[in-house]
Amino acid sequence: MFSRFPFRISFLAIVIPGCACLNGTTALGEWRTTQINEMSYVPLGEVAEAFAMKPTKRRKEPREIGFAGETHQLVVKTGTREVIVDGVRHWLSFPVATRGGQAFVTLADINATMGPAMSPAAVKQIGKVKTVVLDPGHGGHDRGGKSAYGYEKDYTLDVVNRTRRILESKKVKVVQSRLSDSFIPLSDRPKMTKNYDKPIFVSIHFNSAEWRPSASGIEVYVLPPLGFPISGKAPDPILDRQKCEGNAIEPASFVLANTMHHTLLGKTGGLDRGVKRARYAVLRYSNDPSILIACAFLTNAQEAKNI
């Protein structure tokens, strides 16, 4: 049952051995800003020019605006948070605005998402990953989602066990948050990185959408920067400003998420659901670069069968 979905046996092993672990803040230079809805926005054309891109003529819909260059491609939809950077979908924290026939993106989103996605070197590099902490989601009494073939907690453990064997064969140090069908408190899982050298934390899950059985694809979650909303939700003046340990390493976590997602899509052919922002406990309580991967949908008949 487990061998038909290539994602299950190789996804982390493909990405992690050569992955650089990044930390710090972006350094993308100065931008000319305009105040829109009490926020600092930057003309999208100037962002494109800074990354050596020019406007493209092709549009799939009226709100779509595209840019391309030798190195980068950028597509946005005005009035939405959706943006495609170098072929990978991302969800901005604030909508793309228009004024006077121009499109604008927030300075915050340039610094937190678009800039690091196109120029990860602008985030201070601290060296290659030396330890991978793999977290099989759920466990014990927490069964997670369910397909016609089994529970999420069993699938996540299987993915991690297979991945661990492959990574260890490549001389990568691997630590697992759980080795059996047991429940580990969510806040304890990311803390397992503290005893290891240059670690990353990767939590493995599968998606469910009983109300929409056709939903499919792969998405990777990372913590939003302090003061930013989560994907798909309006800004919350209280929750968005609550500090957590993961805020300090968010830039590094984002670069890890972007790198991982880009490679997963290329190797598995899965539907791109994007790099998204969320405040899951395993991301909030982390002191090292951390992401959560939702591999596929247990509630999608074809994906569940392949899993």
Model-derived regions: residue spans:
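Primary recognition of N-terminal secretory signal peptides and signal-anchoring hydrophobic helices
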Residues: 2, 21-141, 145-148, 158, ...
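Bacterial N-terminal signal peptides that target proteins for export
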Residues: 2-12
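Active-site-proximal helix/loop segments of hydrolytic enzymes
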Residues: 150-307
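Intrinsically disordered, low-complexity segments enriched in proline/serine/threonine
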Residues: 8, 19, 237-239
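Bacterial N-terminal signal peptides
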Residues: 10-23
